[in-house]
């Protein structure tokens, strides 16, 4: 067993006492099957003080993104930085450092090959600045300057890149306090290819919390996936997607405070006002 962990670049298995589980009001956070089944299903759009927040179809989400790039001239790296910062901020609010005791909490960030993976890289960098200890698994990096730069930034900040993830859920549960799902975003379609099919299968057996960026990976953007991963935290970016109505985790945040008011009105997003200068807003 120790030889396997050495092969994975993970070192000796750390005992669970080193990284105590996050303690919430009323007891520990253990997002296993019991808490998942007990959560009520959230149907329809979220009702906020200012009205009903719109949940986007895949087509609507793509149209909003295209207008941000083409009409409003945002760049990909610009929105990626804002989105990744939002994700790290939401994680820090849902799982504050004070919940973990004296040791910096270890966080496994699993990044996919697209922009969602880029959001994860930015998120990891900000988590490091916030005092967490992220490690990244990035098995399918695109050959593009933007992603090369994001990887370099993480490496310069001494964030390790792991060649493999532990092959058993219990190993991840022992080594990490949180897993960030940055594999697939709202534009994903079709069957899940390897190595991500195996990774999602491992994640489906975790008891540590999963934080999903924009959409839980492996879920249909509109219909969800009753047999898919079950995140404890969902960070919807720009606006929530329809699959978020099926989210039954503890924390749902909205991030990506960059939507121009005219674009919001055009698509009737009805986004709630962000508090003060915050870049995230808690929806549940």
Swiss-Prot record:
Keywords noted in UniProt: Isomerase, Lipid transport, Metal-binding, Mitochondrion, NAD, NADP, Nucleotide-binding, Potassium, Secreted, Transit peptide, Transport
Disulfide pairings: none
YjeF N-terminal domain residues: 61-271
Catalytic activity field: (6R)-NADHX = (6S)-NADHX; (6R)-NADPHX = (6S)-NADPHX
Names of the cofactor(s): K(+)
Extent of the transit peptide: 1-55
Cell location: Mitochondrion; Secreted
Family: Belongs to the NnrE/AIBP family.
Protein name in the entry: NAD(P)H-hydrate epimerase
Protein species of origin: Monodelphis domestica (Gray short-tailed opossum)
Gene name for this UniProt entry: NAXE
